[in-house]
């Protein structure tokens, strides 16, 4: 039974981390509805690592292929160096905001902002923001021709995802679309930008819950990690294919329903 719980958490994390519907909100709400324990900091850190590994594996060509390129292929090398710089710039806001929250609001996890009411309202507000993004004129900006101000702006919105119900992928994809990005590349950049953000969150969780790892055991954590890794790969692949010919409408509807259902059950 314990392993089934870890598999469930891994599935929820893997699927909802990349679909624009908020992984934190779903982990919290589904735990309450099913009457099972909160995943805890150690498990959260482990399954988040599974999502990072999935990003690295899925985009391994984008991440690693610039290494060892010949000096003749300057354009290819510059593109990937530029992409790395963009990811770095886009990560700055969440480091500043996340670090400040951890230092000055240490009980943030128990704050009213993480209540069911807050999650429901944020989910509905995010549905409206995603609607604005989906209704905006379809742009042509992509990973090859974006500028660093785009990276910082998307990173700024990513920082707001520390509030449960926002959805890191939802707010970064939406902000990119409003800025004029092409849909598929908006999702791709969102996922790549998630590598340092999710990794930093996992590291912080690990530091503050180191002793929990020994009480849970290696094998259950490995099960959660692998489940997250595999479900994350499915979610990434699905969303990139889906965005080739579709927008955010289905997720907007889902987020409204999700928020309303929570409100009706308060």
Curated annotation (Swiss-Prot):
One GO term describing the cellular component: plasma membrane
Domain of life: Bacteria
Keywords from the named record: Antibiotic resistance, Cell inner membrane, Cell membrane, Cell shape, Cell wall biogenesis/degradation, Hydrolase, Membrane, Peptidoglycan synthesis, Transmembrane, Transmembrane helix
InterPro entries: UppP
UniProt entry tagged with the keyword Cell membrane: yes
Top-level EC class: hydrolase
GO molecular function: undecaprenyl-diphosphatase activity
Pfam families, A to Z: BacA (PF02673)
Example GO biological process: peptidoglycan biosynthetic process
Signal sequence extent: none
Location of this chain's protein in the cell: Cell inner membrane
Reactions catalysed according to its record: di-trans,octa-cis-undecaprenyl diphosphate + H2O = di-trans,octa-cis-undecaprenyl phosphate + phosphate + H(+)
Membrane topology: Multi-pass membrane protein
EC number: 3.6.1.27
Keyword Membrane listed: yes
Transmembrane segments: 39-59, 86-106, 112-132, 153-173, 189-209, 216-236, 246-266
Other known facts: Bacitracin is thought to be involved in the inhibition of peptidoglycan synthesis by sequestering undecaprenyl diphosphate, thereby reducing the pool of lipid carrier available.
PANTHER family: UNDECAPRENYL-DIPHOSPHATASE
Function: Catalyzes the dephosphorylation of undecaprenyl diphosphate (UPP). Confers resistance to bacitracin.
Family under the similarity heading: Belongs to the UppP family.
Protein name: Undecaprenyl-diphosphatase
Species assigned in the record: Prochlorococcus marinus (strain MIT 9215)
């Amino acid at each position: 039974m314990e392993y089934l719980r870890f598999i469930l958490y891994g599935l929820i994390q893997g699927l909802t981390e990349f679909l624009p519907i908020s992984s934190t909100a779903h982990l919290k709400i589904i735990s309450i509805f099913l009457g099972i324990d909160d995943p805890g900091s150690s498990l959260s850190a482990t399954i988040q690592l599974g999502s990072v590994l999935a990003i690295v594996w899925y985009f391994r060509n984008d991440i690693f292929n610039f290494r060892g390129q010949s000096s003749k292929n300057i354009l290819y090398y510059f593109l990937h160096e530029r992409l790395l710089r963009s990811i770095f710039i886009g990560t700055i806001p969440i480091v500043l905001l996340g670090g400040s929250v951890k230092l000055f609001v240490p009980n943030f996890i128990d704050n009213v902002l993480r209540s069911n009411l807050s999650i429901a309202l944020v989910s509905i507000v995010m549905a409206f923001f995603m609607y604005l993004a989906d209704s905006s004129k379809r742009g042509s900006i992509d990973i090859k021709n974006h500028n660093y101000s785009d990276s910082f702006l998307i990173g700024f919105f990513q920082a707001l995802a520390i509030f449960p119900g926002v959805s890191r992928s939802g707010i970064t994809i939406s902000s990119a679309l409003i800025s004029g990005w092409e849909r598929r590349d908006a999702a791709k950049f969102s996922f790549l930008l998630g590598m340092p953000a999710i990794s930093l969150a996992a590291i912080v969780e690990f530091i503050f819950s180191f002793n929990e790892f020994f009480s849970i055991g290696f094998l259950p954590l490995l099960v959660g990690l692998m489940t997250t890794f595999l479900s994350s790969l499915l979610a990434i692949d699905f969303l990139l294919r889906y965005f080739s010919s579709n927008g955010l409408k289905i997720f907007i509807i889902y987020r409204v329903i999700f928020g309303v259902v929570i409100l009706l059950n308060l």
